[in-house]
């Protein structure tokens, strides 16, 4: 009996009393529940701040909060409160605390314990990953915990009943919706979010596969992003191909216009005299340069020849180095001009001097008192130069160097010629002119050179 009493005393002294163990655990849990996490506290302060209501604020009834401007929220507020500017990281944090996205077209989040004017409920919001890990791998019961459980079952200790409600947020945390921060990046994010919501609702009630469900969600998200990246790559390649096709079409059209514009010039001749097939077509010139200033004389001559061939009518005017110099003046025209002048024929009729007929004239002029300037019906191939004679009164020469224009007696009277002497002088001048013209015409005809019609 003494040995049994000593053993009981040793056993009682070796293990702490069950009431003390449960009291310490309850105090620790109560201390944890008394203060919310810094993330929840800062988020609540952001939503409550009226100065940033245009960026983030409560909804009408205060049950949810809305991020109206995600870009400004990430740029201005996140670095101030959370030391980063990643909006996706903020959304993932909300997801771990059980927040759910209400509508797909707006960043509106809700939680049963996150309401306007009820800040005390923030203590009931816990991280979902910690609870899931504790539920997935429960520790083996120790002898002390078994004794505490027996004491609770017997009703001896009532303080230990306080920590039991801590499992209630697990049901609220396992909400059937997950927040998706990648919805702003792709139009297919709605279906991915629904898929993740279905997977989350299926795994939350069990509680045992929380860690594996989170890993599966990350894998599915990576796969979705990979598919999205591949799709964008294909679209980019398609757009590049379209741009290349448009550029090729425009270059072909420009080349066609270039060939059509320069085909008429390049097919005739080139400035160096080489074949146009061996030389690439010249670049097109502006219309003003093409019309007013040809690139070379060869092209100008060829273009003129082509224009004559197209018209089909020969140019009656004579040309000197490709330039028209007017119609050739025939003997008929020369005779008509002489008739209009009337000077030469009248003087020839008075004198009756004969002009030697030309060899090519089939009807020579008659001698005697006939006119020597009668036009033959057949025109000669060379022009006749008939200048209009100019007559001046003949004054006698001076008698001496000191008596210029004065008579013997010192008078300044001039001595004029008689009518017969003046007529003889005119006849002599006409004969000399006719001989000069005939001699010049024969010499020019013998050398094969035609006149210019002057």
Curated annotation (Swiss-Prot):
Annotated keywords: Coiled coil, DNA-binding, Nucleus, Phosphoprotein, Stress response, Transcription, Transcription regulation
Ranges of biased composition (kind: Polar residues): 182-191
GO biological process: regulation of transcription by RNA polymerase II
InterPro entries on file: HSF_DNA-bd, WH-like_DNA-bd_sf, WH_DNA-bd_sf
Biased composition (Gly residues): 203-217
Pfam families: HSF_DNA-bind (PF00447)
PTM annotation: Exhibits temperature-dependent phosphorylation.
Alphabetical list of PANTHER family matching this protein: HEAT SHOCK TRANSCRIPTION FACTOR, HEAT STRESS TRANSCRIPTION FACTOR B-2B
Subunit structure: Homotrimer.
Protein name: Heat stress transcription factor B-2c
Organism encoding this protein: Oryza sativa subsp. japonica (Rice)
């Amino acid at each position: 009996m003494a040995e049994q009493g000593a053993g009981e005393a040793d056993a009682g002294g070796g293990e702490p009393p069950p009431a003390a163990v449960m009291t310490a655990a309850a105090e620790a849990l109560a201390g944890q529940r008394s203060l919310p996490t810094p993330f929840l506290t800062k988020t609540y302060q952001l939503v409550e701040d009226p100065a940033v209501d245009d960026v983030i604020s409560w909804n009408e009834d205060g049950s949810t909060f809305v991020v109206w401007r995600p870009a400004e929220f990430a740029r201005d507020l996140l670095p101030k409160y959370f030391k980063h500017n990643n909006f996706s990281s903020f959304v993932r944090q909300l997801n771990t605390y059980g927040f759910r996205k209400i509508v797909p077209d707006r960043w509106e989040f809700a939680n049963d314990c996150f309401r306007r004017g009820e800040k005390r409920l923030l203590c009931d919001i816990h991280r979902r990953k910690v609870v899931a890990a504790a539920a997935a791998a429960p520790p083996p019961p120790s002898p002390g915990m078994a004794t505490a459980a027996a004491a609770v079952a017997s009703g001896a200790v009532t303080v230990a009943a306080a920590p039991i409600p801590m499992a209630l947020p697990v049901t609220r945390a396992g909400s059937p919706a997950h927040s998706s921060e990648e919805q702003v990046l792709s139009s297919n994010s709605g279906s991915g979010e629904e898929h993740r919501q279905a997977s989350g609702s299926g795994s939350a009630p069990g509680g045992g596969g929380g860690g594996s469900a989170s890993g599966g969600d990350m894998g599915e998200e990576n796969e979705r992003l990979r598919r999205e990246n591949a799709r964008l790559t294909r679209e980019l390649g398609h757009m590049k191909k379209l741009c290349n096709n448009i550029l090729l079409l425009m270059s072909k059209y420009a080349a066609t216009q270039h060939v059509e514009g320069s085909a008429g010039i390049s097919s005739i001749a080139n400035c160096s005299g080489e074949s146009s097939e061996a030389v690439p077509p010249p670049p097109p010139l502006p219309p003003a340069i093409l019309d007013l200033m040809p690139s070379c004389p060869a092209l100008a001559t060829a273009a003129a020849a082509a224009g004559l061939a197209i018209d089909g009518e020969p140019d009656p005017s004579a040309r000197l180095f490709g330039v028209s110099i007017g119609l050739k003046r025939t003997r008929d025209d020369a005779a008509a001009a002489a008739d209009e002048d009337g000077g030469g024929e009248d003087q020839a009729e008075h004198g009756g001097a004969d002009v030697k007929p030309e060899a090519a004239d089939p009807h020579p002029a008659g001698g005697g008192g006939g006119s020597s300037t009668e036009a033959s019906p057949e025109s000669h191939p060379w022009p006749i130069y008939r200048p209009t004679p100019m007559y001046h009164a003949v004054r006698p020469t001076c008698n001496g160097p000191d008596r210029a224009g004065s008579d013997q007696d010192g008078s300044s009277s001039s001595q004029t010629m008689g009518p017969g002497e003046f007529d003889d002088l005119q006849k002599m001048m006409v004969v000399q002119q006719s001989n000069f013209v005939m001699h010049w015409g024969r010499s020019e005809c013998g050398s094969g050179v035609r006149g210019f019609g002057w």
